[in-house]
């Protein structure tokens, strides 16, 4: 280094790289033992020049974080708030949605696009038409009502198959073909004002009837199913269904006479109280079981006069038993 360069750069490499202090050295200002600094060994071929890093002392600055939520709203939080939020996020959270009650995936949600599409219900309606259902009001009603909303999520993939499915309490939701057949028999091309359903179950058949009749009255004797039907029907906001908790064998004399009565459970006969609540010219459709309980037949009862009824036995079916009382 020349004299001129020495004046401009008075410090040499030996001034920048110094040996660490010994463990027993003391700080000149405080008189306390100095903390030794670790010495990192370098590989044999590495450069001996050590980088000089100057770390300024800067006071912490609280920065705000700008984030956007799902709806696009901008949220501004301080760094301390973000740290507190992170601590809270580590705490266990309770389940917030009804669909999180089980660890299993929700089939109704994962298959929502398929199940709620019009094409799926149209295929069901095509099968009904192929099976002999011809009343356009009934076909339109079956296409309108989302059956998957009335079954358990685990059975949602089977909602539009022609199958009876369990709904709890030893009860079932009837096959779509049976629902359509019974409603078509009850209507028979006539305008329906008041209709009575015995056995609400999950509420599906009442929802279909509501698309065909002006007013639908439905009776359920099992309280949990009565509550479930209300829950299922509430999102659909159907204004012309009136649910009742009571004994279906007694009927609903206060709302009689009815243009049609549909019974969704099989007794050994059709209760006389229900026959008398038919308007003259009205129809009642019900499954009737044999005395030995081995078979059931779909039966059509037509009221032809004040004290006259005509009975026709039609299709072999299978329903849960019709019982009296409430539970």
UniProtKB/Swiss-Prot annotation:
SUPFAM superfamilies: S-adenosyl-L-methionine-dependent methyltransferases. It catalyses: [protein]-L-isoaspartate + S-adenosyl-L-methionine = [protein]-L-isoaspartate alpha-methyl ester + S-adenosyl-L-homocysteine. Residues 15-30 have a biased composition (Basic and acidic residues). It is found in: Cytoplasm. The keyword Cytoplasm applies. Its EC number is 2.1.1.77. Keywords: Cytoplasm, Methyltransferase, S-adenosyl-L-methionine, Transferase. The active site is at 174. Residues 1-48 are annotated as: Disordered. Pfam families: PCMT. GO terms for cellular component: cytoplasm. It is an enzyme of class 2 (transferase). It comes from the Bacteria. One of its GO terms (biological process) is protein repair. InterPro entries: PCMT, SAM-dependent_MTases_sf. One of its GO terms (molecular function) is protein-L-isoaspartate (D-aspartate) O-methyltransferase activity. Catalyzes the methyl esterification of L-isoaspartyl residues in peptides and proteins that result from spontaneous decomposition of normal L-aspartyl and L-asparaginyl residues. It plays a role in the repair and/or degradation of damaged proteins. Belongs to the methyltransferase superfamily. L-isoaspartyl/D-aspartyl protein methyltransferase family. PANTHER family: PROTEIN-L-ISOASPARTATE O-METHYLTRANSFERASE (PTHR11579), PROTEIN-L-ISOASPARTATE(D-ASPARTATE) O-METHYLTRANSFERASE (PTHR11579:SF0). NCBIfam families: pimt (TIGR00080), PRK00312.1 (NF001453). This is Protein-L-isoaspartate O-methyltransferase. The lineage of its organism: Bacteria, Pseudomonadati, Pseudomonadota, Betaproteobacteria, Burkholderiales.
């Amino acid at each position: 280094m020349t004299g001129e360069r020495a004046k401009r750069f008075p410090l040499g490499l030996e001034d920048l790289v110094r040996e660490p202090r010994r463990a027993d050295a003391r700080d000149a200002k405080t008189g306390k033992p100095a903390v030794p600094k670790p010495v990192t060994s370098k590989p044999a071929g590495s450069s001996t020049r050590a980088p000089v890093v100057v770390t300024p002392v800067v006071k912490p600055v609280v920065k705000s974080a700008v984030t956007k939520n799902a709806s696009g709203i901008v949220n501004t939080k301080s760094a301390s708030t973000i740290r507190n939020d992170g601590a809270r996020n580590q705490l266990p959270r309770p389940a917030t949605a009804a669909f999180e009650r089980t660890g299993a995936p929700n089939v109704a949600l994962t298959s929502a696009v398929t199940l709620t599409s019009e094409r799926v219900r149209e295929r069901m309606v095509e099968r009904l038409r192929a099976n002999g259902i011809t009343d356009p009001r009934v076909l339109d009603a079956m296409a309108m009502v989302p059956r998957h909303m009335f079954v358990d999520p685990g059975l949602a993939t089977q909602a539009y198959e022609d199958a009876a499915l369990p709904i709890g309490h030893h009860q079932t939701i009837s096959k779509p073909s049976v629902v359509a057949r019974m409603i078509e028999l009850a209507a028979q091309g006539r305008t329906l004002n008041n209709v009575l359903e015995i056995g609400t179950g999950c509420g599906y058949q009442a929802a279909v009837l509501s698309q065909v009749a002006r007013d639908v009255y439905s009776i359920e004797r099992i309280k949990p199913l009565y509550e479930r039907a209300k829950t299922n029907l509430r999102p659909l906001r159907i204004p012309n269904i009136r649910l009742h908790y009571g004994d279906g064998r007694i009927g609903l004399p206060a709302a009689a006479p009815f243009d049609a009565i549909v019974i969704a459970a099989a007794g050994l006969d059709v209760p006389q109280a229900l026959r008398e609540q038919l308007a003259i010219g009205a129809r009642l459709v019900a499954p009737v079981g044999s005395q030995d309980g081995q078979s059931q037949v779909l039966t059509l009862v037509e009221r032809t006069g004040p004290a006259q009824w005509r009975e026709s036995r039609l299709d072999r079916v299978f329903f849960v038993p019709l019982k009296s009382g409430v539970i």
